[in-house]
From Swiss-Prot:
Keywords: ATP-binding, Cell cycle, DNA-binding, Meiosis, Nucleotide-binding, Nucleus, Sporulation. It comes from Saccharomyces cerevisiae (strain ATCC 204508 / S288c). This is Meiotic recombination protein DMC1. Its main location: nucleus. Belongs to the RecA family. DMC1 subfamily. InterPro entries: AAA+_ATPase (IPR003593), Dmc1 (IPR011940), DNA_recomb/repair_Rad51_C (IPR013632), DNA_recomb/repair_RecA-like (IPR016467), DNA_repair_Rad51/TF_NusA_a-hlx (IPR010995), P-loop_NTPase (IPR027417), RecA_ATP-bd (IPR020588), RecA_monomer-monomer_interface (IPR020587). DsDNA binds at residues 223, 229, 235. One of its GO terms (biological process) is mitotic recombination. It is found in: Nucleus. Double stacked ring-shaped homooctamer. Forms a ternary complex with MEI5 and SAE3. Interacts with RDH54. The lineage of its organism: Eukaryota, Fungi, Dikarya, Ascomycota, Saccharomycotina. Signal peptide: none annotated. SsDNA binds at residues 223, 226, 229, 235, 305.
Length: 334
């Protein structure tokens, strides 16, 4: 059974329950405001946040937190459910086109919602170009592989170019100014700021208008802020929390999360992470486990680029060729 774009939108909106609903279960308005100040805007987020973390929010005692948790549990069932219900939830998943039909094909339709997709590769492979292309294709109608929605873009390296968005939008015959207006942009100054920006996303996403979160690139700030083996453990703990939050946002708001990542040379790298030439994505096991889909990008012949699907819960390993043009990521003319 196919699910239409309208049905997906209505289902997503129906499942986004504001914390204001808790007022009907005895939680006063001042405590709800405290939740919002702590970056918690929906009932689902209340349920997925630990009591220990909720108690860290200024003004919330253990007694209040327990009462809030109890009220949230009355609104949304969090125990065992029939697998048929989970099937209904999975049917709300849809894909966003990358701009390349060949790449969309090996991905099973495109970048999937409710999960994290990571692309990694050396410089000039098209990671940022793919991010820019997705900013436009996400706004296309459903029948054209879009999501008819907005994009939240976190830029960690200062490589976001609004003029490039306008150029790609013109290639798709969309209004350039409207496309730019539908992209919420933030420059992450360091890893701490990057994590804060993701915490703040709950308020934006609770509108139900967003379809995609882009982080370009996920590890740049963490590499700078945590240097050497002595800080590696702390870095991975922070990264794990960051990725956990992104995954929660993807599931709760039915959005796609698209991460770009850098690579490092490691001649002795294990086959689990490394490509044939020994390059491997940074972030280790933490990032590998968080990303549902991992795609290696590399340079091909001439202007061609090669995308290899390395890990996916839905599709087998496969690769395809794409090029970077005025419309962003497109198919090779060959």
């Amino acid at each position: 059974m196919s699910v239409t774009g309208t049905e997906i939108d209505s289902d997503t909106a129906k499942n986004i329950l504001s914390v204001d609903e808790l007022q009907n279960y005895g939680i006063n308005a001042s405590d709800l405001q405290k939740l919002k100040s702590g970056g918690i805007y929906t009932v689902n987020t209340v349920l997925s946040t630990t009591r220990r973390h909720l108690c860290k929010i200024k003004g919330l005692s253990e007694v209040k937190v327990e009462k809030i948790k109890e009220a949230a549990g009355k609104i949304i069932q969090v125990g065992f459910i029939p697998a048929t219900v989970q099937l209904d939830i999975r049917q709300r998943v849809y894909s966003l086109s990358t701009g390349s039909k060949q790449l969309d094909s090996i991905l099973g339709g495109g970048i999937m919602t409710m999960s994290i997709t990571e692309v990694f590769g050396e410089f000039r492979c098209g990671k940022t170009q793919m991010s820019h292309t997705l900013c436009v294709t996400t706004q296309l109608p459903r029948e054209m592989g879009g999501g008819e929605g907005k994009v939240a873009y976190i830029d960690t390296e200062g490589t976001f170019r609004p003029e490039r968005i306008k150029q790609i939008a013109e290639g798709y015959e969309l209004d350039p100014e409207s496309c730019l207006a539908n992209v919420s942009y933030a420059r992450a100054l360091n890893s701490e700021h990057q994590m804060e920006l993701v915490e703040q996303l709950g308020e934006e996403l609770s509108s139900g208008d967003y379809r995609l979160i882009v982080v370009d690139s996920i590890m740049a700030n963490f590499r700078v802020d945590y240097c050497g083996r002595g800080e590696l453990s702390e870095r991975q703990q922070k990264l794990n929390q960051h990725l956990f939050k992104l995954n929660r946002l993807a599931e709760e708001f039915n959005v796609a999360v698209f991460l770009t990542n850098q690579v490092q040379s490691d001649p002795g790298a294990s086959a689990l992470f490394a490509s044939a030439d020994g390059r491997k994505p940074i972030g280790g096991h933490v990032l590998a486990h968080a990303s549902a889909t991992r795609i290696l990008l590399r340079k091909g012949r001439g202007d061609e680029r090669v995308a290899k699907l390395q890990d996916s819960p839905d599709m087998p390993e496969k690769e395809c060729v794409y090029v970077i043009g005025e419309k962003g990521i497109t198919d090779s003319s060959d």
